[in-house]
Structure formats: C-alpha cells, structure tokens
Amino acid sequence: MNTLEQTIGNTPLVKLQRLGPDNGSEIWVKLEGNNPAGSVKDRAALSMIVEAEKRGEIKPGDVLIEATSGNTGIALAMIAALKGYRMKLLMPDNMSQERRAAMRAYGAELILVTKEQGMEGARDLALAMSERGEGKLLDQFNNPDNPYAHYTTTGPEIWRQTSGRITHFVSSMGTTGTITGVSRFLREQEKPVTIVGLQPEEGSSIPGIRRWPAEYMPGIFNASLVDEVLDIHQNDAENTMRELAVREGIFCGVSSGGAVAGALRVARATPGAIVVAIICDRGDRYLSTGVFGEEHFSQGAGI
C-alpha cells in the first residue's frame, strides 16, 4: 500500500465471544473504525469524490459541500485534505465536540445549524449553498456513489470473510448507503441472505441512525433490498455499546451498539444463524457526551 486511500476498506470481521446467545447462532461484526478516518463513511467519502472526478464534475481546488451528522464529514474532510479540495460541512450543533474538532483538524470549514433544525435543516442549507454557486454538493443522501462503495467493497468483503456462510446482515440506517449497497451485492449471490435494517424507536435519538420523515427519505434507499426493519430504543443501543466495550473489548459508538442490539435480537430468534453487523465507528468520538458514564468517574462517583 502506497497511499492513504488504499488503506480504506478490507476491515476485520470478528466473532463476538461473550454476548451471543447459546443456540448455535454466531454474531460477527465488521470493525469499520479501523478505516483511517475512523468509520465506515470513509468508503462512501472516497467513492463520491473519486467517481465525481472520473466524470469530470470536480477537480482539486474546488469547494465541496456536504451535510453531515459527523462521520461522513470527518471522512470527507480527510479525503479533501488528501486530494486538495476545500470542504464545507453543515452539521447540527448538538453533535459531539470530538466530531467538530476532527473536521476542523483536517482543515474543513464547519457551519453549524441548531439542533432544532437538525439534519433536515443542514441538508436544506447545503442545497441552498450549492444553488447559490458556493460549491459542489456531494449529497450523500441521494448520490448513488454512496451505496456503490458498499456494493463494490463492503459486500464482497463480508461474503469472502464469512466464506458465504452469512444468513443475516444487520445494519443501522442513516443515509442507507451501507445497507443498500451491501444488500444489492448479497442479493446477487447464490444463497438467500436476510437483510435487516435498524431505525430508532419513535422518540429515541441515536447518532448516525435516523427515522426520516417521508419528504427527507434518502433517494438512494431501495425498500425492496431490505427484508425487515427493527425499531431500536436509545437505551438498548447505549447499553449494548457499553457491553461491547466491557465484555468484548470493542470500543464503538451508539449506532454500532444499536446494530449489535438488533443482531442479538435476530440471533436469539434464529438458532444456527450466521449474523453479520456493522460496527461503523469508534467510541472515542462520543466520550464528551457522557454516554459511557465517564462523567461519573470525573466527579469521583464509584471510586
């Protein structure tokens, strides 16, 4: 490997040792935090920029625009720095300090909208900026180069790493790029694989997973590629995230906890299943939020 972009992908797939049910099923997780900018979004970020370059839509020195809740923005900021683009990122102001700091460290310009405006507001502002000629909108929510990254890399890797044994694929749904691309690839293989998507329960807030209003449903989403959608409560996602750290040694974020909570639900209901879930990022991106309970230790509680 000679360049940073060549280190994106080919992430490890590991079997959970202690959290899975004792019914002959197996839960395997793909450690996307091993990508250079720390998340599964490295794949889509690289794909959206490289494919746009191939079509002659952008060139180094151009301004790129994107709305993000964090991971895509960090990944795009990394690729923009690597390739010589100027990156403008729109993000709600209730996202973690680590995300803001990482984007700025890569040299991106960060524009915050209010938490009340949310991702919908960030998307609207990104579109308006693009229409005013302030830069090229990459539009991860409607850009087919997003799922294409997972069709050409993530899906084939999972199939190869499980030697085709996979029976269920479980993925949190945000932009839906991961589940759409992986499912499309798995649908083309010689055996059926059940595709399970995850969204937050009504009233739950899980960073990186969305329950989109109909008018904001990502254009890349193809409902025919998803067999089942599970609702995940915020508490289940957070508790599973913490369990992964202390029982499996896997330090990940809340949406990854949600994915594994869903995988556990599938495995318990399906003896003998080979379930694969995506660990989409690392836990260090969430420390300032207190979700791991570290604020109690800083106050001396429990010591």
UniProtKB/Swiss-Prot annotation:
Sequence positions bearing N6-(pyridoxal phosphate)lysine: K41
GO BP field: cysteine biosynthetic process; cysteine biosynthetic process from serine
InterPro entries in alphabetical order: Cys_synth, Cys_Synth/Cystath_Beta-Synth, CysM, P-phosphate_BS, TrpB-like_PALP, TrpB-like_PALP_sf
Enzymatic class: transferase
Cofactor(s) this protein requires: pyridoxal 5'-phosphate
Positions bound to pyridoxal 5'-phosphate: N71, G174, T175, T176, G177, T178, S255
Gene3D superfamilies listed in its UniProt record: 3.40.50.1100
A molecular function (GO) term: cysteine synthase activity
Cellular compartments per GO CC: cytoplasm
Reaction(s) the record says it catalyses: O-acetyl-L-serine + hydrogen sulfide = L-cysteine + acetate
Listed pathway(s): Amino-acid biosynthesis; L-cysteine biosynthesis; L-cysteine from L-serine: step 2/2
EC number in record: 2.5.1.47
Keyword annotations from UniProtKB, A to Z: Amino-acid biosynthesis, Cysteine biosynthesis, Pyridoxal phosphate, Transferase
Family (UniProt): Belongs to the cysteine synthase/cystathionine beta-synthase family.
Function statement: Two cysteine synthase enzymes are found. Both catalyze the same reaction. Cysteine synthase B can also use thiosulfate in place of sulfide to give cysteine thiosulfonate as a product.
PANTHER family membership: CYSTATHIONINE BETA-SYNTHASE
NCBIfam families: cysKM (TIGR01136), cysM (TIGR01138), PRK11761.1 (NF008735)
Protein name: Cysteine synthase B
Organism phylogeny: Bacteria, Pseudomonadati, Pseudomonadota, Gammaproteobacteria, Enterobacterales
